[in-house]
Amino acid sequence: MTAVGTDGLDAIRTDPSRAVLGFDFDGTLAPIVDDPAAARAHPGAAPALARLAPRVGTLAIITGRPARVAVEYGGFEGVDGLVVLGQYGLERWESGALTEPDPPPGIAEARAKLPGVLEAAGAPPGTFVEDKTHAIVVHTRRCAEPQVALDRLRSIIEALAERTGLAVEPGRYVLELRPPGVDKGRALRSLADAFAAKHGAPPSAVLFAGDDLGDLAAFDAVDALRAEGVPGVTVCSASNEVTELAERADLVVDGPAGIVELLGTLAAADSAPE
């Protein structure tokens, strides 16, 4: 645990009712699986979130998935007080209500062109596409050599993104096409700013937990808030596939099981993580 991370956890423990806590879904609250549609939250995640939600100022899941999908796969429908920001913050689910914009035109164009692009490039067997409505994802996890396949496809996906006005976000054997200027850092910052606007003061602390490259933007947001005087904590749900987050994080835990343990500790009034 880093010194600044310890300060952040102490601030959460001292004044949890003004803390803003954000968690990624896949790889953080839910184990990574070969089929995205088969992903489900760790069985302890929803109960732990339900215990924590009444104690903190804002409790949110920030995910690249559609918000309703994360709610369904996580079993979060009955977690009072939980906010789910889907599609990197484009969608907001709260108390059963979903707010979402129309998909940008570039997504429809990319959706139409991507099958032909992959075929022309000779995409390796096992390559598949996930349609998130506001984003399109190319997966290589099922390929015989996932990283080789990902590297082979990277340049053609980047070229398609440029033609359609989209951005490419790499991840754990994925390349995601999504609108530019949308990321988990902006989503986390929006939660902190909304809290400050509502309460007339910044949060007592901010925490974000993630596992993949797309979560680094949220780590950057925590760092920016620290620079403004808000204690912060960055948490890595560790895997053997991505090391960058562990190198940046204040606290590294053992995958979704470790995240659930952290949630339970945060929910306990008389203790904080070591």
Protein language model features and the residues they cover:
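The start of beta-strands in P-loop NTPase/AAA+ ATPase cores
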Residues: 19-21, 82, 206
